[in-house]
């Protein structure tokens, strides 16, 4: 009996608690422990940013991205917390960086070559471990990229000049198709059709309905922007994402019909052309077993949507800037006359068009279309003194960086900003390094071709003094004009008309 009384296991510890501990003490200890965990979590990162605050911080930051759009949210947080700061997206730590030294480090190194985004969202649009734009399968991405690089450089780039000039002339001769009853030109639609037509001739080579495909591309792009950062729960509520799923399916179905026609032509051709285009190269890679049919279809889709999605909007913004800055237009026209004269532009003119080139650069700096780059850290690293852990998401706010460092008049549109050579670490419209834009060279050449060919023929004017600064825009994955605005059309005045000659 005595031994049992001395044995601590003899007692019911739970029943003894009230005797040795006040009732309120346990909740206080639990709360203290929880707050200590939260405090320790926040203390693990010295990077500026909103507080964790028992999980409320991550929830608020993700909601802000969904509500404001990626671009606006990034600018908000950089302005609030500095040029190297931390938030959370989908509960994952995410850095937003607009500091040139940090961007240079990230773009330079291969352990930042992966991107991030909702897996379910990327699966819905066909980009999860597929294509090139958001493909995070490093082995497949490395196998696919050479097809894009080959098609977008060398002989393909040279051929693009002739093809693009022909497409522009054809579409300018049919301006009534993209003009309203007052003769105002829907420039966005015009540019999208030119870009799609040029891309199709170069990379696929199958006749298509430009008008219908352009609409489907816009639907696909809207779905891409909407789904990229959505939480997983969004995809469990079918009525929320069905319209986006349909938009993706519409474009994929249309593209599949075109690609099947391409396969048929290849299989029935007696002799292949000496120069195989992008689609043919991919289809032969599929026949060798290097790629799947799904890989081929997604790569061709991405190749055809790239220019109508981004470059067309870039040229649209450029034409608005030209309309507002007559002295810039005058300088451009003098150079065009001196270099090109009355003939069509050629590939050997490109290096001589310095004013046009600086205008393109300044337009992309002042009013970017793609102003964000999304990456993921594949290993632990130190960036500008901050520890960046493996798996950390990173958004490079390039558009903001272009207005913070180096340029003498960062908040003005002026060619003075490119009067001197700009070190490439301070100006990255296409990125650089292992994951830079595969089409950066052909994009520059194509924009020169479009501007020279169009401006030789027309002087452009906006409606009611509409300008870039006052234009309603959507700040998402890329920056686009709000197309519900009624003042996005332009007036094209023929250069040889009396109205233009009187200027």
Curated annotation (Swiss-Prot):
Keyword Lipid metabolism: yes
PANTHER family reported in the protein's UniProt record: AROMATASE, CYTOCHROME P450 FAMILY 4
Residue ranges that the Swiss-Prot or TrEMBL entry lists as coiled coil: none
Transmembrane segments: 19-39, 51-71, 303-323
Gene Ontology BP term (one): female gonad development
Enzyme class name: oxidoreductase
Species of origin: Canis lupus familiaris (Dog)
UniProt KW Protein biosynthesis keyword: no
Membrane topology field: Multi-pass membrane protein
CDD domains given in the database record: CYP19A1
Annotated metabolic or biological route of this protein: Steroid hormone biosynthesis
Cofactor entry: heme
Catalytic activity from the UniProt record: testosterone + 3 reduced [NADPH--hemoprotein reductase] + 3 O2 = 17beta-estradiol + formate + 3 oxidized [NADPH--hemoprotein reductase] + 4 H2O + 4 H(+); androst-4-ene-3,17-dione + 3 reduced [NADPH--hemoprotein reductase] + 3 O2 = estrone + formate + 3 oxidized [NADPH--hemoprotein reductase] + 4 H2O + 4 H(+); androst-4-ene-3,17-dione + reduced [NADPH--hemoprotein reductase] + O2 = 19-hydroxyandrost-4-ene-3,17-dione + oxidized [NADPH--hemoprotein reductase] + H2O + H(+); 19-hydroxyandrost-4-ene-3,17-dione + reduced [NADPH--hemoprotein reductase] + O2 = 19-oxo-androst-4-ene-3,17-dione + oxidized [NADPH--hemoprotein reductase] + 2 H2O + H(+)
Name used for this protein in its record: Aromatase
Function, as annotated: A cytochrome P450 monooxygenase that catalyzes the conversion of C19 androgens, androst-4-ene-3,17-dione (androstenedione) and testosterone to the C18 estrogens, estrone and estradiol, respectively. Catalyzes three successive oxidations of C19 androgens: two conventional oxidations at C19 yielding 19-hydroxy and 19-oxo/19-aldehyde derivatives, followed by a third oxidative aromatization step that involves C1-beta hydrogen abstraction combined with cleavage of the C10-C19 bond to yield a phenolic A ring and formic acid.
GO molecular function, one term: heme binding
Family: Belongs to the cytochrome P450 family.
EC number: 1.14.14.14
Binding residues annotated for heme, in chain numbering: 437
Binding locations of substrate: 309, 374
Cellular component per GO, a single term: endoplasmic reticulum
Keywords, alphabetical: Endoplasmic reticulum, Heme, Iron, Lipid metabolism, Membrane, Metal-binding, Microsome, Monooxygenase, Oxidoreductase, Transmembrane, Transmembrane helix
Location(s), subcellular: Endoplasmic reticulum membrane; Microsome membrane
């Amino acid at each position: 009996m005595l031994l049992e009384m001395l044995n601590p296991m003899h007692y019911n510890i739970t029943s003894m608690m009230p005797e040795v501990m006040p009732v309120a003490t346990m909740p206080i200890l639990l709360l203290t422990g929880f707050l200590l965990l939260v405090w320790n979590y926040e203390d693990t990162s010295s990077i500026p940013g909103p507080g964790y605050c028992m999980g409320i911080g991550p929830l608020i930051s993700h909601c802000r991205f969904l509500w404001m759009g990626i671009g606006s949210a990034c600018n908000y947080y950089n302005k609030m917390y500095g040029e190297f700061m931390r938030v959370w997206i989908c509960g994952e730590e995410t850095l937003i960086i607009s500091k040139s030294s940090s961007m240079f480090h990230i773009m330079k190194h291969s352990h930042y070559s992966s991107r991030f985004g909702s897996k379910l969202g990327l699966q819905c649009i066909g980009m999860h471990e597929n294509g090139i734009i958001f493909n995070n399968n490093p082995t497949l991405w490395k196998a696919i990229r050479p097809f894009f690089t080959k098609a977008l450089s060398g002989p393909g780039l040279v051929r693009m000049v002739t093809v693009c000039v022909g497409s522009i002339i054809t579409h300018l001769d049919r301006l009534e198709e993209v003009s309203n009853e007052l003769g105002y030109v829907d420039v966005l639609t015009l540019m999208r059709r030119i870009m799609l037509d040029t891309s199709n001739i170069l990379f696929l080579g199958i006749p298509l309905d430009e008008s219908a495909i352009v609409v489907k591309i816009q639907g696909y792009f809207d779905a891409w922007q909407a789904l990229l950062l959505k939480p997983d729960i969004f995809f469990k509520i079918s009525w929320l994402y069905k319209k986006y799923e349909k938009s993706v399916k519409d474009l994929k179905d249309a593209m599949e019909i075109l690609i099947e026609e391409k396969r048929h032509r290849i299989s029935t051709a007696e002799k292949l052309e000496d120069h195989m285009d992008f689609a043919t190269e991919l289809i032969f890679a599929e026949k060798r077993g290097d790629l799947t049919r799904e890989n081929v279809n997604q790569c061709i889709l991405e190749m055809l949507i790239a220019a109508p999605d981004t470059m067309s909007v870039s040229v649209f913004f450029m034409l608005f800037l030209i309309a507002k800055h007559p002295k810039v237009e005058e300088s451009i026209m003098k150079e065009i006359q001196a270099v090109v004269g009355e003939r069509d532009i050629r590939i050997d003119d490109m290096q001589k068009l310095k004013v046009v080139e600086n205008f393109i650069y300044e337009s992309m700096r002042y009013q970017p279309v793609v102003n964000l780059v999304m990456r993921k850290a594949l290993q632990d690293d130190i960036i500008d003194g901050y520890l960046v852990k493996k798996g950390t998401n990173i958004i490079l706010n390039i558009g903001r960086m272009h207005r913070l460092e180096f340029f003498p008049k960062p908040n003005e549109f002026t060619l003075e900003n490119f009067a001197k050579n700009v070190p490439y670490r301070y100006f990255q419209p296409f990125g650089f390094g292992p994951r830079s834009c595969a089409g950066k060279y052909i994009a520059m050449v194509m924009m020169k071709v479009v501007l020279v060919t169009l401006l030789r023929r027309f002087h452009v004017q906006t409606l009611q003094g509409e300008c870039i600064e006052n234009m309603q825009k959507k700040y998402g994955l890329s920056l686009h004009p709000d197309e519900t605005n009624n003042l996005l059309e332009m007036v094209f005045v023929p250069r040889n008309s009396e109205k233009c000659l009187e200027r």
